[in-house]
């Protein structure tokens, strides 16, 4: 039999074992599509971002007009920009659903894969933040000022740290230049960490909805899941294109149509929708350092999830009490997202504080208790 180049060539061999002959569980559902969708999002963002960067000027006096120029005068510049801006939203939708899947089906018990995933989330958040600042609109300028200023809450070195990050005493030219450099660099770092994420995943193989070993029943990734992923991709690209072509500014802030003005503050400073849950948690604590710590904890709490797993079963498939708790957590996050977009006044303040409290309580206290309770009910 002639040797198969797919299995013998040093580079094709890696692709083959990762994407073609990879043994995959036969019963993984559409919730397992989001990994490949995230990879497609990353590719789309890098390509559209590169095309935008060729027409962008990282200068406070020119940034806003260079983006306007891209939209008006560059061939399909409006489409590239709309795809890039809304592509970021879809990136976050996919990553939140991907994390939700991991929580529901106990994928976090693959600790290395989970931890690299959390690092990926943090890097993505950093990338989105520095990118949002670049077009120098009113909201993005003030968002950058407020969020970077949070570092001044760090005792002793805080103020020095902020001025070092800004490159001056306010968000100005040096800030924009370094944010552009970071925004260009970080997606490639994300791509690198993604490869590590996959390497760890392929050590153990995919989890499945039953949470049991699937060694006895594996199928090749191609053609089964490659085709399933293409369907998922089509189902994601359709709403992305619909959004980019029909209502590209739906998720943006109207304040960003005004060029940045350091002398006037917008009435309600708020980040993009995908950061609102964390922003609501930040605002719910009436103390700067406390708020910053809660903000950090709201994402870093994911690193504790593997240690809070007390159930003898891996997934929530057959654990109705944990399921109820999971969907309460999901609803809670939606409430936090809504609160983050509202002004700081009654009744939003108290709703935000209650939602923030229940967010941490659910994860840190209720999940382990319910897990233990279910063990007892099932006589484990």
Swiss-Prot record:
GO biological process: mitochondrial electron transport, ubiquinol to cytochrome c
InterPro entries reported in the protein's UniProt record: Cyt_b/b6_C (IPR005798), Cyt_b/b6_C_sf (IPR036150), Cyt_b/b6_N (IPR005797), Cytb/b6-like_sf (IPR027387), Cytochrome_b (IPR030689), Cytochrome_b_C_euk/bac (IPR048260), Cytochrome_b_N_euk/bac (IPR048259), Di-haem_cyt_TM (IPR016174)
Known cofactor(s): heme b
Cell compartments where the protein resides: Mitochondrion inner membrane
Residue spans crossing the bilayer: 34-54, 78-99, 114-134, 179-199, 227-247, 289-309, 321-341, 348-368
Entries under Pfam families matching the protein: Cytochrom_B_C (PF00032), Cytochrome_B (PF00033)
Binding site for heme b b562: 84, 183
Residues given in the record as heme b b566 binding sites: 98, 197
CC terms in the record's Gene Ontology section: mitochondrial inner membrane; respiratory chain complex III
Keyword Transport assigned: yes
Binding site for a ubiquinone: 202
Other noteworthy facts: Heme 1 (or BL or b562) is low-potential and absorbs at about 562 nm, and heme 2 (or BH or b566) is high-potential and absorbs at about 566 nm.
Biological role stated in the UniProt entry: Component of the ubiquinol-cytochrome c reductase complex (complex III or cytochrome b-c1 complex) that is part of the mitochondrial respiratory chain. The b-c1 complex mediates electron transfer from ubiquinol to cytochrome c. Contributes to the generation of a proton gradient across the mitochondrial membrane that is then used for ATP synthesis.
The protein's name: Cytochrome b
Gene: MT-CYB
